[in-house]
Amino acid sequence: MSGKLVLVTGVTGFIGAHVAEQLLQAGYRVRGTVRSMEKADELIRLNPGLKDKIEFVIVKDVSASNAFDGVLKDVELICHIASPFFVENVTDNKSQLLDPAVKGTLGILEAAQGVKSIKRIVITSSFAAVGNFQIDPHNNKVYTEKDWNPITYEEALTTDNGIVAYCASKKLAEEAAREYVKEKKPSYDICTINPPYVYGPPIHPMKNMDSLNTSNQIFWKLIDGSKEATPFYYYYVDVRDVAAAHVFALENAKLSNGRMLVSKGVFTTGDICKVLRKEFPNKSDVIAEPVDITVDPSFFKLDNSFSKSLGFKYHSDEECYVDTAKKLWERAEEFK
């Protein structure tokens, strides 16, 4: 156990909470940024095993200048996860998505520049920074870590598509981080983790089921009793694997200034319903009817072979679907 101190930004978020939990299991010490101590208290209430194990510090806005003043003392490694995720009701791409994502990422890099103890910053990016979301996805394209979303800043400013703007924010933030390291040559290096849709058990504070992360909202609609099984398929990864990738990347020499696409494969809403109806026959009244969905052979490919070549392993589809459903039903009971 190394006992190195890791700063986790956004520690009370969907991914951040899992990252903190896995860091502690791996023997690291964790300092987590929160917007309020109420959020920190709620995280501990939901996960009593984390009690007295995380040092919480308040950072109200990670994109504010000097947001990390006094937060980085003795830190050796950083997992920078906090970032906006608004897709609906975006009225100003620049102020709601682009600026916060870029400033939040550059802010942590700039703050870390003067802290010689920091050796690596692992940044939560996204497949959104990799793929081209302005073309038909049925294009036979194979995406790897070498690919970049081709959208420009100017296009991102003017698009009225919230999803395209969000994807642009992830691309621009990652691009800015890599440019910064290239130009400033800090004492640390960086690595990005690039997941597609992220499913998995939510262990973080939530206001209600409507505040689920965007991916899990799709999953919840399949099992919330509304029986809404909209035929849909896409690439996904378990949140526990996203968290494991952050921990994996912190001290892996092969990921110095690298990039790691993490994806289990393609899910279909029909497959999710089939697995869950088999596993939970007593829940058939709330699980949507499975719809047979064929994935078009021309649908783009997300190549995860680099992560596998490093020895990284993924949860099975069944583990992800079953564990996610159990936790979602459990959390729904909280809000009744």
From Swiss-Prot:
**Where do the annotations place NADP(+) binding?**
39, 166
Q: Which Gene3D superfamilies match?
A: NAD(P)-binding Rossmann-like Domain (3.40.50.720)
Q: Keyword Oxidoreductase, does the record have it?
A: yes
> Is Iron-sulfur set as a keyword in this record?
no
Q: Where do the coiled-coil regions begin and end?
A: none
- Subcellular compartments: Cytoplasm; Nucleus
The UniProt GO MF terms for this protein read: methylglyoxal reductase (NADPH) activity; oxidoreductase activity, acting on the CH-OH group of donors, NAD or NADP as acceptor
What is the protein's name according to its record? Putative uncharacterized oxidoreductase C513.07
Which organism is this entry from? Answer: Schizosaccharomyces pombe (strain 972 / ATCC 24843) (Fission yeast)
